Amino acid sequence: MTDAVRILMCPPHHYDVDYVINPWMEGNIHRSSRERAEEQWHQLYEVLKTYATIDLVDPQPGWPDMVFTANAGLVLGDTVVLSRFFHPERQGEEPYFQHWFEDRGYTVHQLPKSLPFEGAGDALLDRSGRWLWAGYGFRSELDAHPYLTNWLDVEVLSLRLVDRRFYHLDTCFCPLTDGYLLYYPAAFDNYSNRLIELRVPAEKRIPISELDAIEFACNAVNIDFLRDGKAERVVVMNKASDDLQQILSDRGFTVVETPLTEFLKAGGAAKCLTLRVTEPRPAAPQASVIQSRVIYLEGHLLDSGLVNRVLDTIVAGGGSFQVLNFNLGEQRLDTSAAEVKVSAPDPAVMADIMGQLIDLGAVSVP
């Protein structure tokens, strides 16, 4: 075993599907077997213990999803950015993870309460440490990404998720050793797929089928391990098709399957159940390229459907929004006014969105 990699896990003593906050939970309320969940978790634990040191955080009653430690936060070096959970059903986990990191001497950063960010579930480091892939669209806000750049001194590449089945980045995207990337392209918008193609050469990209995607093949743990003086690249996952296993084998990876079907009922698998707490910092500080603008709208915003068209335009263009002010006219014939903060992953996307918004009648606020 090697001490180079440390992974945080949480025993599933209180795990169950108690509510619905993603599509996988629908129809599975209280249909998970605690006994099988314990057995599958321990099998994963034993597999990973072969390749890494496993740290544990104590499970807490009332917080069944605490077992998914990938969402505790994002760790680089001795710094952690704690999660701000989108759903109230998970927000009670935050202080327990905060105490765990503080007790071990990490520098802990916390985002504003109004800014959701779900840790390493939505932020995955390129395995060479060159940049951080960060997801947004369902659980994490794009406006959280500049904080990651500032606090962690890392280049952040923002990817927009568009398939609600793949609500976290780590459910459909897995950076691997030596620049390889395992991912499900249909989970991303066009801009994000173009960005992936620009950063990852074609020979390094491993797009997977929907069949493998719904088995959470991308929700995998990749560990490099030295065995008898020989380097071994291990990918631990719930399940992979024969074709995918062959593709990975041809690229020098050893696939280790371990069933995690009880956790799929809650929308998670191997990666969701783990958090790597030994991620090295990149060497050079980076600046954020994420853009923000404020626009002003005035008119019969609701009756005309203008406000909905504006917000839809922002999202369809690859951006995100926050309504800062909305003043509704007192009478039906009165006009309404709104201020909306628009965020985009880079200047080109912002320029395209702003052009469309101005065509709709929006005014850019200096």
Description of each model-found segment:
Residues 1-285:
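The feature marks the mature, well-folded catalytic cores of soluble enzymes
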Residues 288-366:
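A conserved regulatory-domain signal marking ACT and ACT-like small-molecule sensing domains
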